[in-house]
Amino acid sequence: MEPLLELSDVVKEFSSPPPVRPLDGLSMVVPPSTMIAVTGVSGKGKSTLLNVMGGLLRPEAGCVRYRKVDLTQATAAQLDAIHRHGIGFVFQTPYLFQALTAYENLELALRASGEKVARDRIFEMLEKLGLDERAEHLPSALSAGQKRRLVLGRALL
């Protein structure tokens, strides 16, 4: 079976004094339909790894392939298509636009990706998240768990 994601001898270094190399020859294969978790102590490269895996950071050496596309050589258009239809991000801190309702936060995700905003699709996602009755609420009126679900829904749209 073809890997969903493959990293081969990935090196990522930051030059800030002193130089830091959080990824040094990392190789791994993620098969389709596999869930992974990245754990470890603070400052050891977890976020760097995820950013490299998603094509947000380019490594100094090595190769990162998503469905055979080399993310280290991908054009901006290729990366945009992958981010729209393949790789989504949910950050540890739920980043929501505080002046926008739950519905508007999801709507903005579709507009930012260039997709036609489909009201039914947004309400369907809100229903799946158990937030359909909170569609017109601002993030300040949502619980921490509801905010996290809203951020997850945004990544899934």
Where are these regions (language model features)?
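Conserved ABC ATPase "signature" region
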Residues: 69-70, 117-134
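Conserved ABC transporter NBD signature motif
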Residues: 62-70
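The feature captures the beta-strand-to-loop junction immediately N-terminal to the Walker
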Residues: 39-41
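ABC-type ATPase nucleotide-binding domains, specifically the catalytic core motifs of the NBD
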Residues: 15-17, 107-119, 128
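Short coil-to-helix segment of the ABC ATPase nucleotide-binding domain corresponding to the Q-loop/switch region
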Residues: 100-108
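Helix-to-loop junction immediately C-terminal to a conserved catalytic motif
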Residues: 54
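ABC ATPase NBD coupling module
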Residues: 20, 71-88
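Conserved ABC ATPase signature
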Residues: 138-142, 146
